[in-house]
């Protein structure tokens, strides 16, 4: 596109520029520079206007907006530079983009109209709102039996172990067609500000396109009855599948699902205002289950912390969000099937990518994503 009129040598010059990628920085402001070049000089002034347009980067928060700014090449000038102010922060996030749109060409042809500016994230700190519901530190009739407040710089080897890989060869895709490779420390497990953070990334590793982490207390901490409180912030993007769940320490009644599975909390990342609580049981080979959900109104589980709880006693399990009861499952509900939940279980925390429940990532999926735990407390 261009404006008719003679240039140097009787031809109108072409305006060219390249997309730009710059480090965002971790404090204050910086500058991104876009070089605009004419393929030959013009005997007349050349003018264009330029404006910024939001992408995933937002004006005010990530850069300073420009609207309709005039840029002039004087006669025989062939290069000009546009400078846009970039607002830096120290928060780890996905790379972000905005556009600089060129318009109203006079005495010049535009070979393209838009420059894409990519702000490459180079930060290490993960941002989150340290607000939300906080559970009581005591309950009538219960005493604190075990807790992990995640105040250290690494996972307690006394309480936890890692599961790594993709489940192969015995349980490829972890039995759910998941797409991630779970790494051993320190790749995807981060400790910051008294929180444990599992980071899911879009990166090639172990033959997979995504990495994340999965930890368990198997053989180290087992639980039977009581109340479990877990305070967490959940991720929000299509294909993410965070889970807080329990499996039996011993398969007393046979292989899964006959010996049971208790899902304290599962979330489908594309539905960030809803969580699921589920009891899986036999007779197999597929699961028979009772599942119910809890939804927030006008908010998501990514906005701030919420507390996911189980109240577990002989022949009955109750599920809570922020101490609001939303599901009760009792022995009578499983009918003639075995009630497998009067045994010792261990805890698993993981952040899956893809799988049967959330589906695969698509163009709307943003990485990295985080499952952030403040504490786990077990009362008996």
Regions found by a protein language model. Name each.
Residues 3, 82-83, 94, 103, ...:
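Small/flexible residues
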Residues 1-2, 240:
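Intrinsically disordered, low-complexity segments used for protein-protein interactions
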Residues 2, 8-127:
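Short boundary segments that mark the start of a structured unit
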Residues 109, 121-380:
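GH16 jelly-roll
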């Amino acid at each position: 596109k261009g404006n008719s009129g003679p240039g140097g040598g009787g031809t109108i010059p072409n305006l060219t520029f390249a997309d730009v990628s710059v480090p965002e920085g971790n404090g204050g402001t910086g500058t991104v520079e876009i070089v605009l070049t004419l393929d030959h000089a013009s005997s007349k002034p050349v003018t264009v206007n330029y404006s910024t347009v939001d992408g995933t980067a937002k004006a005010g928060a990530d850069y300073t907006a420009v609207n309709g700014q005039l840029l002039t090449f004087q006669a025989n000038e062939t290069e000009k530079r546009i400078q846009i102010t970039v607002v830096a922060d120290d928060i780890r996030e996905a790379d972000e983009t905005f556009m600089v749109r060129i318009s109203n060409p006079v005495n010049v042809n535009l070979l393209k109209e838009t420059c894409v500016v990519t702000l490459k994230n180079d930060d290490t700190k993960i941002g989150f709102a340290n607000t939300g519901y906080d559970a009581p530190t005591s309950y009538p009739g219960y005493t604190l039996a075990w807790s992990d407040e995640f105040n250290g710089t690494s996972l307690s080897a006394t309480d936890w172990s890692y599961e790594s890989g993709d489940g192969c060869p015995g349980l490829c895709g972890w039995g759910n067609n998941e797409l991630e490779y779970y790494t051993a420390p320190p790749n995807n497990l981060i400790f910051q500000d008294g929180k444990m953070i599992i980071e899911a990334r879009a990166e090639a590793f172990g033959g997979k396109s995504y990495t994340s982490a999965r930890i368990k207390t198997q053989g180290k901490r087992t639980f039977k009855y009581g109340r479990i409180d877990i305070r967490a912030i959940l991720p929000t993007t299509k294909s993410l599948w965070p889970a807080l769940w329990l499996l039996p320490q011993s398969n007393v009644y046979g292989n899964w699902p006959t010996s049971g599975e208790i899902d304290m909390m599962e979330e489908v990342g594309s539905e960030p205002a809803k969580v699921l609580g589920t009891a899986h049981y036999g007779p197999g080979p597929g699961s028979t289950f009772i599942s119910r959900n809890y939804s927030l109104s006008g908010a998501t589980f990514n906005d701030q912390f919420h507390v996911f709880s189980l109240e577990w006693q002989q022949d009955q399990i109750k599920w809570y969000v922020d101490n609001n009861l939303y599901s009760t499952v009792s022995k009578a509900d499983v009918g003639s099937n075995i009630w497998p939940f009067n045994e010792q279980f261990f805890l698993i925390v993981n952040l899956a990518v893809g799988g049967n429940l959330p589906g695969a990532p698509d163009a709307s999926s943003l990485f990295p994503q985080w499952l952030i735990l403040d504490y786990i407390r077990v009362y008996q």
